[in-house]
């Protein structure tokens, strides 16, 4: 992962802290797999959570994917954007499908999340979304199972 992507994760993290000072940022770039930050029985190919945050007042765990992008202006770029975000040839490695699989795993494995966050119980919901560094045409052309928001729209998710 390049430095600009890491910088964007930091920007999103700082914005979350500004919008909700009580939000707990539990970690960034957390790997979910066997012997990872969040341990699983085997490597499931879930990748990492860019930002894991917890709102204790609302009992919500946030799984936030951060994408620093700079494309999608010409028809070819929009097509490529669509494939990267939503529709790859196997529908398994697009950014949205990976984030959705991670969200589903977290929803079915709340005990692992509870343990990582050191919470008393699993009485919380999980919300997942993608924050993009700039608006993309794709958001207006196709619906997705995971919300895509810009940095300026982050307040609507928290």
Model-derived features: where do they sit?
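Intrinsically disordered, low-complexity Ser/Thr/Pro/Gly-rich regulatory segments
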Residues: 1-158
């Amino acid at each position: 992962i390049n430095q600009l992507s890491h910088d964007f994760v930091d920007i999103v993290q700082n914005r979350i802290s500004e919008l909700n000072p009580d939000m707990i940022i539990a970690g960034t770039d957390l790997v979910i797999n066997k012997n990872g930050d969040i341990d699983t029985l085997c490597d499931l190919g879930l990748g990492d959570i860019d930002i894991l945050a917890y709102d204790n007042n609302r009992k919500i765990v946030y799984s936030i994917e951060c994408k620093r992008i700079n494309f999608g202006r010409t028809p070819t770029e929009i097509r490529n954007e669509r494939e990267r975000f939503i529709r790859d040839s196997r529908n398994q490695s697009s950014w949205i499908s990976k984030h959705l699989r991670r969200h589903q795993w977290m929803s079915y494995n709340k005990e692992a999340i509870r343990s990582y966050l050191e919470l008393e119980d699993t009485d919380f919901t999980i919300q997942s979304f993608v924050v993009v560094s700039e608006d993309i045409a794709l958001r207006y052309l196709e619906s997705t199972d995971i919300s895509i928001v810009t940095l300026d729209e982050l307040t609507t998710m928290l």
